[in-house]
Design a protein with these regions (language model features):
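Generic serine detector
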Residues: 3-4, 13, 23, 38, ...
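A structural signal for well-ordered alpha-helices, especially hydrophobic packing surfaces
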Residues: 9, 33-36, 61-68, 98, ...
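Early exported N-terminus immediately downstream of N-terminal targeting peptides
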Residues: 1-35
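Extended amphipathic alpha-helical interaction segments
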Residues: 21-92
Length: 136
């Protein structure tokens, strides 16, 4: 009986959420890179703000790696003693976690873009005001 708990049912490996979790990880990596690059190129943020953003995104990527590592343990034969139902429950939980991580990354990216635009707009207004008032 216990040896059967180490065997992986092929339907578990082909469970759609397994591929979706991997897909989320790829999307998060791409979005995190784009976000950090945009953050740096915006020229609206201090070195400290950029470092903070990098730390947050690095922590997010580390969490993603942990989730995918756990997924691989769940779907690799002889790694864990679990029933099929237990494996599906764990996969569903990992899927929800990856959805949350992607949503967080997406919202962070949008918020950073909005903040950069707000700061740029503010700088334009300051420059316009200086020009109108003859201030250098």
């Amino acid at each position: 009986f216990f040896s059967s708990l180490k065997t992986i049912n092929p339907t578990i490996s082909r469970y759609a959420k397994v591929a979706d979790i991997i897909s989320y990880q790829v999307r998060i990596i791409k979005l995190a890179r784009q976000t950090l690059q945009s953050f740096r190129e915006a020229n609206q943020f201090s070195v400290e703000e950029i470092e903070y953003c990098k730390k947050v995104l690095d922590a997010l990527l580390d969490d993603c790696i942990q989730s995918v590592t756990e997924l691989l343990e769940i779907i690799t034969p002889d790694k864990l003693q679990m029933t099929d139902d237990e494996r599906l429950v764990r996969i569903d939980k990992l899927y929800g976690d990856m959805q949350d991580k992607f949503t967080f990354c997406n919202v962070m990216s949008e918020d950073i873009g909005l903040l950069a635009l707000q700061r740029l707009s503010e700088q334009i207004e300051i420059n316009r005001s200086k020009l109108i008032n003859g201030i250098k």
